Amino acid sequence: MISLDLLLKHMQWANKEIYSEVSELDSKVLDYFVVDPEWKVKTIMLHIAKASNNYAQYLQGATEPTSLDLEEPLNSDDIKILIEKLYEIDQVLIDNQNIGDVDLTFITRRGEQTHKSSTVFSQMVFHAAEHRAQIVAALDKHNFRSINLDNYDVWSYIRAH
């Protein structure tokens, strides 16, 4: 059976690798979007990090998470800062994977919620994958096809490690 450890480490690796690839592209790609101009590449990149930051805090018992103090990246240097911060956040998630399937209660914009830690871990992994695909789709829409998601699947992670 696939392990949570593998899923989390794959997520951390895929986040870092895809963000690194985006950092090598012209900064104009940060303003690309698929359909909704509210969801530009730069917005999605920050959103993944902010959501992961919240998930990490929930898993550590925080009821109301402290917001991640970063802005949308405007250039390669900004992306590199975001890469480092997201890697650290993902490491917190990896380090907290053995908390057991406990109930976690936290406040979101939808009010107070209680979920099992397994639900939070599952949502976190899915959320990051969903939005990495959205980033690549926005680039693809504008004929930037250098990032192939098949290079960042679980198989590729296993081969690389």
What is the meaning of each model-derived region?
Residues I2-L7, I79:
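Active-site rim elements
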Residues Q97-G111:
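Acidic catalytic patch
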Residues D5-S20, E24-D69, G111-H161:
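Short, contiguous alpha-helical
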Residues A62-G100:
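Helix-adjacent hinge/juxtasegments
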